[in-house]
């Protein structure tokens, strides 16, 4: 018999979230994009999970700018502190941008380290909040713009539902 403290706790959580992101373009702007997204977390053990996210930042745009991203990667979960469970993650994938004033669009490889916490409401329901800093490599690659990569960052808040354990 395997002790419960070491028993694998495979579970699938799915959810939706609201994002408020400091836009990475134009460089050094104070523009924030808002949007919605979805995620899925598959817990392999009590402390290791794999996450996949899709976010669509389409609101409060700067002259038509939008940013979307599709990311996946590992997530490390700490022990519970009451109903809170902090976590750290490092996701990778791609970010897509429609530049302002319809000057073009681009897709870039993105790295996204971040962290947050989930708050268990019930056995199957949790709230979560996280901070993420994205690095869009080889961007923006536009003539006349500084050679600084696009680095959107900000907060996500959402709700998750445990599909199965």
PLM regions and their residue ranges:
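Outer-membrane beta-barrel biogenesis signature
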Residues: 1-16, 79, 83, 163-165
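Gram-negative (and chloroplast) outer-membrane scaffold detector with strong preference
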Residues: 39-112, 119-121, 152-165
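Short, surface-exposed loop/turn motifs at beta-strand boundaries within globular domains
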Residues: 7-9, 31-33, 43
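Predominantly the C-terminal beta-signal and adjacent terminal strand-loop region
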Residues: 119-165
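Extracellular loop and loop/strand-boundary signature of outer-membrane beta-barrel proteins
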Residues: 23-26, 58-62, 98-103, 140-147
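Generic short beta-strand segments
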Residues: 18-22, 55-57, 92-93, 132-135
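Surface-exposed strand-loop-strand hairpins of Gram-negative outer-membrane beta-barrel proteins
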Residues: 19-39, 53, 106
């Amino acid at each position: 018999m395997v002790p419960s403290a070491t028993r694998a706790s495979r579970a699938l959580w799915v959810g939706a979230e609201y994002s408020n992101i400091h836009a990475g373009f134009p460089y050094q702007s104070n523009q924030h994009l808002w949007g919605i997204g979805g995620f899925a977390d598959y817990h392999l053990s009590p402390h290791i999970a794999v996450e996949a996210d899709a976010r669509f930042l389409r609101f409060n745009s700067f002259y038509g700018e939008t940013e979307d991203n599709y990311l996946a990667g590992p997530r490390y979960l700490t022990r519970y502190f009451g109903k809170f469970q902090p976590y750290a993650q490092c996701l990778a994938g791609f970010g897509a941008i429609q530049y302002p004033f319809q000057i073009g669009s681009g897709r870039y490889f993105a790295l996204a380290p971040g962290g947050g916490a989930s708050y268990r409401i019930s056995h199957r329901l949790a709230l979560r909040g996280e901070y993420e800093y994205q690095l869009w490599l080889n961007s923006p690659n536009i003539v006349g713009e500084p050679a600084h990569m696009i680095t959107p960052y900000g907060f996500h808040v959402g709700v998750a539902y445990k599909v199965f354990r």
